[in-house]
Amino acid sequence: MGKRVLVVGGVAGGASAAARVRRLDAEASITVFERGEHVSFSNCSLPYFLSRTVGDAESLVLMTPEGFKASYDIDVRINNEVCAIDRAAKKIRVRNELTGEEYEEAYDELVLSPGSSPIRPRSIEGVFLPHVFTVRNVNDIVKLDKYAGQEGKADVVVIGGGFIGLEVAENLREAGKHV
């Protein structure tokens, strides 16, 4: 049996790294851990769901865990968050977000690609209200779309002038919102 490679994070970087390891080593045992429920989705396409340039949310998902297994013989575990790394013992501790079960996995090589989390400064009043959204994954964009699609929700403020923020503003405008 080949070396045991664990990848923390299953979106763009982690999914690419896992596929690359497979191309370099056909014998490796590769497992990807993703804390969210989707793996390998198109981050850059998320805003285009708001204007229906991307027709449905599932079109944003490029590969499923089953697809990774069938195409690359890579085990992908969604809803599994890596909680701790023991570098000396070469083990990680993982928590299944659905069951709460925790377990350990040993590795020969570990790839870290955990992604990011949006910052919501606690000093800004109202930043955690239910009508304040962040856009990081498929679930986030679906929630924003559902809220923005309600009758009477015509005015939208987008905070963040990076590519995703600008594309969210553009696509909300395309969807008829005042941005």
Predicted feature locations:
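Residue-level preference for nonpolar/small residues embedded in alpha-helices
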Residues: 60-61, 103, 164
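Conserved phosphate-binding and hydrolysis motifs of nucleotide-dependent enzymes
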Residues: 9-14, 115, 160-165
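Alpha-helix initiation/capping motif
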Residues: 55-56, 121, 162
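Beta1-alpha1 glycine-rich phosphate/pyrophosphate-binding loop at the start
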Residues: 2-76, 171-179
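Glycine-/small-residue-rich active-site loops that bind phosphorylated ligands and cofactors
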Residues: 13, 38, 84, 99, ...
